[in-house]
């Protein structure tokens, strides 16, 4: 099962904002058993976002998660780009509009904004691509969207980390179903990654697991993560590597 992630925002490309969203999304998709094959960042330009989406769809991932660009300002154009990429008109979601209205009324009651009225900028957030299922935003105004397109599950989420995380956990992950997936982290006592490489390759072929290695500077340990669906198989991988002379301790 493969997945791709697209994060949207000029601020990500200028370095003014660190893209923590893609790391969080990738970690949760990995826990669900998805292999994240690509993470792409694009600026707030309709045609560029559309192009990146079309490129991702051509690779036929099982899941595509897009984050950012759903707010009320002029440069929040992600939903428009999605509609263009999928050739679906934007339609007003009345349910979303009512939630947005209530959101601003509550902010006004708390004294956080001066005007609770639904101006055109706020109404813009209630438009979703035709056929999309709205995803509830419990932490903000802009709804997300879930679209099934040619067998690909597409999720469009806000860029604010608090809003994105809540929507991912509450709306996205439940739609991906339940799948047992395990990742175990170890430190392999070996100083040369090149000597470890053939052993890892043999283990991957033999046990049908995914293994990621990461050198820890020039110390005597190399970090290893083993991904699989069966804990017994992962233990057999460790036993196999130990039989090849590699010592382990748990950690990372």
Swiss-Prot record:
It comes from the Archaea. Pfam families: MoCF_biosynth. Gene3D superfamilies: MoaB/Mog-like domain. InterPro entries: CinA (IPR050101), CinA_Arc (IPR023055), MoaB/Mog-like_dom_sf (IPR036425), MoaB/Mog_dom (IPR001453). Belongs to the CinA family. NCBIfam families: molyb_syn (TIGR00177), PRK03670.1 (NF002977). This is Protein PYRAB15930. It comes from Pyrococcus abyssi (strain GE5 / Orsay). The lineage of its organism: Archaea, Methanobacteriati, Methanobacteriota, Thermococci, Thermococcales.
């Amino acid at each position: 099962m493969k997945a791709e992630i697209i994060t949207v925002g000029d601020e990500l490309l200028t370095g003014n904002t660190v893209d923590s969203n893609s790391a969080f999304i990738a970690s949760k998709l990995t826990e669900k058993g998805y292999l994240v094959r690509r993470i792409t960042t694009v600026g707030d330009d309709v045609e560029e976002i559309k192009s990146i989406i079309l490129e991702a769809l051509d690779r036929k991932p099982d899941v595509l998660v897009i984050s950012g660009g759903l707010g009320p300002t002029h440069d929040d154009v992600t939903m428009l780009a999605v509609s263009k990429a999928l050739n679906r008109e934007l339609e007003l979601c009345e349910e979303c509009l009512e939630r947005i209205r209530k959101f601003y009324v509550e902010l006004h009651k708390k004294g956080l904004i001066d005007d609770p009225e639904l101006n055109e900028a706020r109404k813009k957030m209630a438009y979703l691509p035709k056929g999309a299922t709205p995803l509830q935003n419990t932490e903000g105004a802009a709804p997300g969207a879930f679209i099934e397109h040619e067998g690909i599950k597409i999720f469009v989420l806000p860029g604010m980390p608090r809003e994105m995380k809540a929507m991912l956990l509450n709306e996205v992950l439940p739609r991906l179903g339940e799948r047992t997936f395990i990742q175990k982290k170890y430190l392999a006592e070996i100083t040369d990654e090149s000597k470890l490489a053939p052993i890892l390759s043999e283990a991957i072929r033999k046990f049908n697991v995914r293994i990621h290695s990461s050198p820890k500077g020039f110390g005597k340990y190399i970090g290893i993560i083993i991904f699989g669906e069966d804990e017994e198989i992962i233990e057999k991988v460790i036993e196999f590597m130990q039989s090849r002379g590699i010592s382990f301790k748990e950690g990372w």
